[in-house]
């Protein structure tokens, strides 16, 4: 029994589209990690602002039955 070698390269090329040409550079960066902190400080600021938003919502609804008895000492 002979061993058959199969070529894995595709015989046909895919159809090109304008959207594919635009998105191609984004896909070429797949798997690469930028050195350093990157956007970590920006994410920290976003998390801080979200925490402030949640505290404001809690203050607005503090008189509700669900949160009755939650002490506010500000």
Swiss-Prot record:
| Topology in membrane | Single-pass membrane protein
UniProt xrefs under InterPro entries:
PSII_PsbH, PSII_PsbH_sf
Q: Where in the cell is it found?
A: Plastid, Chloroplast thylakoid membrane
Q: Gene3D superfamilies from the xrefs?
A: Photosystem II reaction center protein H
- One Pfam family it belongs to: PsbH
Q: Where are the disulfide bridges?
A: none
Listed under GO biological process in this entry are:
photosynthesis; protein stabilization
What about PTM?
Phosphorylation is a light-dependent reaction catalyzed by a membrane-bound kinase; phosphorylation occurs on Thr residue(s) in the N-terminus of the protein.
Keyword Repeat listed? The answer is no
The Swiss-Prot or TrEMBL record describes its family as follows: Belongs to the PsbH family.
NCBIfam families registered for this protein in UniProt: PRK02624.1
Function of this protein?
One of the components of the core complex of photosystem II (PSII), required for its stability and/or assembly. PSII is a light-driven water:plastoquinone oxidoreductase that uses light energy to abstract electrons from H(2)O, generating O(2) and a proton gradient subsequently used for ATP formation. It consists of a core antenna complex that captures photons, and an electron transfer chain that converts photonic excitation into a charge separation.
HAMAP family assigned to the protein according to its UniProt record, in alphabetical order? PSII_PsbH
* Protein name, as recorded: Photosystem II reaction center protein H
């Amino acid at each position: 029994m002979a061993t058959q070698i199969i070529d894995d390269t595709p015989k046909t090329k895919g159809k090109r589209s304008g959207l594919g040409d635009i998105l191609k550079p984004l896909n070429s960066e797949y798997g690469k990690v930028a050195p350093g902190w990157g956007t970590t400080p920006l994410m920290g600021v976003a998390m801080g602002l979200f925490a402030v938003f949640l505290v404001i919502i809690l203050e607005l609804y503090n008189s509700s039955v669900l949160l009755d008895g939650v002490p506010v000492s500000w």
